[in-house]
């Protein structure tokens, strides 16, 4: 289950755009071995709101493109498909029948800015940011170079499989 909450008014959000991002999320989850009914919240915000959230949660007072709030714990350098192969979850990890993976907060305003900066489509940038964030929900990180390489490789593999190119 993907819950979409549009909390901004600067960018138009069509059903087609929302459906596309939901399909991207579902595909990324499947590719990462999430074979259980799950829940992700996808929030669309503007630069001001993501700046406020970034400041409140990370003590960084600036806008960013996407924030991820994973609900599951992972051992260092391990991801979902390496840790939860037996679907060994506690009851607290669920909302009804759905495993709660976490929240994705996406600044659509920043996604548009970056699409222009990187000279590719807005849809491609939003798709990339959603894949990036979903991978964070599944335990990926990019603080160390080795982890960054692993994460970037998975991002590109997923986007390429979806035929979403620069």
UniProtKB/Swiss-Prot annotation:
InterPro entries: MetalPrtase_cat_dom_sf_prd (IPR023091), YbeY (IPR002036), YbeY_CS (IPR020549). Its main location: cytoplasm. Its cofactor is Zn(2+). Zn(2+) binds at residues 132, 136, 142. Its EC number is 3.1.-.-. It is found in: Cytoplasm. Binds 1 zinc ion. GO terms for biological process: rRNA processing. One of its GO terms (molecular function) is RNA endonuclease activity. Keywords: Cytoplasm, Endonuclease, Hydrolase, Metal-binding, Nuclease, Ribosome biogenesis, rRNA processing, Zinc. It comes from the Bacteria. GO terms for cellular component: cytoplasm. Belongs to the endoribonuclease YbeY family. NCBIfam families: rRNA maturation RNase YbeY (TIGR00043). Single strand-specific metallo-endoribonuclease involved in late-stage 70S ribosome quality control and in maturation of the 3' terminus of the 16S rRNA. This is Endoribonuclease YbeY. It comes from Clostridium botulinum (strain Eklund 17B / Type B). The gene is ybeY.
């Amino acid at each position: 289950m993907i819950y979409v909450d549009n909390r901004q008014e600067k960018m138009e959000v069509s059903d087609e755009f929302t459906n596309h991002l939901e399909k991207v999320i579902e595909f990324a989850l499947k590719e990462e071995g999430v074979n259980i009914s799950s829940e992700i919240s996808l929030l669309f915000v503007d630069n001001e709101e993501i700046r406020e959230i970034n400041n409140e949660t990370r003590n960084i007072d600036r806008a960013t493109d996407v924030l991820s709030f994973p609900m599951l714990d992972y051992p260092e350098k391990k991801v979902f498909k390496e840790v939860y192969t037996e679907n060994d979850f506690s009851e607290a990890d669920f909302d009804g029948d759905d495993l709660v993976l976490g929240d994705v907060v996406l600044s659509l305003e920043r996604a548009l800015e970056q699409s222009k900066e990187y000279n590719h489509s807005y849809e491609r940038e939003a798709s990339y940011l959603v894949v990036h964030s979903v991978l964070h929900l599944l335990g990926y990180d990019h603080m160390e170079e080795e982890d960054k390489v692993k994460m970037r490789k998975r991002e590109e593999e997923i986007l390429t499989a979806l035929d979403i190119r620069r």
